[in-house]
């Protein structure tokens, strides 16, 4: 088989399964609205949970940072790319979340890959929730450690793995809020079991930070848990991009020595770190935004419970409507788009086979009439 045949067959498999991914060129796609071509859509696919991507203070901080520091960092943080804005942001994050240290990464994907590959050796094991994000499962699979996956959000399933002997160290991996189902992990139970077995817990709270907990401190704070490793990302509630790993002092120093994704990547622009400091202030002062988001979630769930579709058991901004069939989910997403509503159909392999869904994400930027319009069209599609 030639390279051309290999590529053609792989593409055809995705087409045959109605799982072919495409990208859409948009003029703007954050907060409440999405502009595509000549048409404006109500955006129910963004992770901009608090609408901060359009916040005037955050935008101004980026602009001011760019004027002072330029638009790039100029190198790895280990060479010339680590500046005062980076150091200030790391300290502010550490103080806010109650950890001695924070390390910045260019993305949540890079942070997860770096931590799992840097910390583990061949005699270690990683025990991961089976529905963990692709960045976690891929990193675990490529790490030198043995990977075992436990049933989603089932502490007893984790316990059955923990009681088995391990020559090295054990790292338990989960998410605070799961990105496709919107449900939350039982973090207190997972931490108790992990600690009792002498292991460490890593929580990726990409979808919880900024939204849950006192002052937006996230899922771990909400559940009274402090994992040994906390990954927070800035592409959701913070409205920007990038990530940080929160940990103890020796762990941070270890990652600075061994985390290749950190050592060999150009650091985020200082201007971005300035904008993230402004976003952090907005998150810390964002109780009204979080309350508004919770109102939108309650409004949607109250009415969506009467739809003839399975509504996920989510109390978060991620509200999945299970369709099942790949092609049907695409048809409904297109019909919603025709009605001026941007909702994404999520299909395998992103989710398990037979669980294609309309993944609806809500934002504090949405107005009550936006939710009403979405529900009106959904009722029309189902009846």
UniProtKB/Swiss-Prot annotation:
One of its GO terms (molecular function) is 8-amino-7-oxononanoate synthase activity. SUPFAM superfamilies: PLP-dependent transferases. The lineage of its organism: Bacteria, Pseudomonadati, Pseudomonadota, Gammaproteobacteria, Enterobacterales. Its EC number is 2.3.1.47. HAMAP family: BioF_aminotrans_2. Coiled coil: none annotated. Catalyzes the decarboxylative condensation of pimeloyl-[acyl-carrier protein] and L-alanine to produce 8-amino-7-oxononanoate (AON), [acyl-carrier protein], and carbon dioxide. This is 8-amino-7-oxononanoate synthase. It comes from Yersinia pestis. The modification N6-(pyridoxal phosphate)lysine is found at residue 236. The gene is bioF. Belongs to the class-II pyridoxal-phosphate-dependent aminotransferase family. BioF subfamily. Substrate binds at residues 21, 133, 350. Homodimer. GO terms for biological process: biotin biosynthetic process. It comes from the Bacteria. Disulfide bonds: none annotated. The keyword Cell division does not apply.
């Amino acid at each position: 088989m030639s390279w051309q045949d290999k590529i053609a067959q792989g593409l055809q498999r995705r087409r045959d399964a109605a799982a072919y991914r495409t990208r859409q060129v948009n003029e703007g796609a954050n907060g409440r609205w999405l502009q595509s071509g000549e048409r404006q859509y109500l955006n129910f696919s963004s992770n901009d949970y608090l609408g901060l991507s359009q916040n005037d203070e955050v935008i101004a901080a980026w602009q001011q940072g760019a004027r002072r520091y330029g638009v790039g960092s100029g190198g790895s943080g280990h060479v010339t790319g680590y500046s005062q804005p980076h150091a200030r942001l790391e300290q502010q994050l550490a103080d806010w979340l109650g950890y001695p240290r924070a390390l910045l990464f260019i993305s949540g994907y890079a942070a997860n890959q770096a931590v799992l590959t840097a910390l583990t050796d061949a005699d270690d094991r990683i025990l991961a929730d089976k529905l963990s994000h692709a960045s976690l499962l891929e990193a675990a699979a490529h790490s030198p450690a043995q990977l075992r996956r436990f049933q989603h959000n089932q502490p007893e399933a984790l316990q059955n793995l923990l009681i088995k002997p391990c020559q090295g160290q054990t790292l338990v991996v989960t998410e605070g809020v799961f990105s496709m189902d919107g449900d939350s992990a039982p973090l207190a139970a997972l931490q108790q079991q992990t600690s009792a077995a002498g292991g460490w817990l890593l929580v990726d709270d990409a979808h919880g930070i900024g939204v849950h907990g006192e002052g937006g401190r996230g899922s771990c704070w909400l559940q009274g848990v402090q994992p040994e490793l906390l990954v927070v990302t800035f592409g959701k509630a913070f409205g920007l991009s990038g990530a940080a790993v929160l940990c103890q002092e020796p762990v941070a120093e270890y990652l600075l020595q061994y985390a290749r994704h950190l050592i060999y990547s150009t650091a985020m622009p200082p201007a971005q770190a300035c904008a993230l400091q402004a976003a952090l202030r907005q998150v810390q002062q964002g109780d009204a935004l979080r309350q508004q988001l919770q109102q939108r979630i309650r409004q949607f769930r109250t009415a969506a419970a009467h739809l003839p579709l399975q509504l996920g058991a989510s109390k978060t901004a991620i509200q999945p409507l299970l369709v099942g069939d790949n092609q049907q989910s695409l048809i409904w997403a297109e019909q919603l788009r025709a009605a001026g509503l941007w909702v994404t159909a999520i299909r395998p392999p992103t989710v398990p086979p037979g669980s294609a869904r309309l993944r609806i994400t809500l934002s504090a930027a949405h107005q009550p009439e936006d939710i009403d319009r979405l529900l009106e069209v959904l009722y029309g599609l189902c009846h």
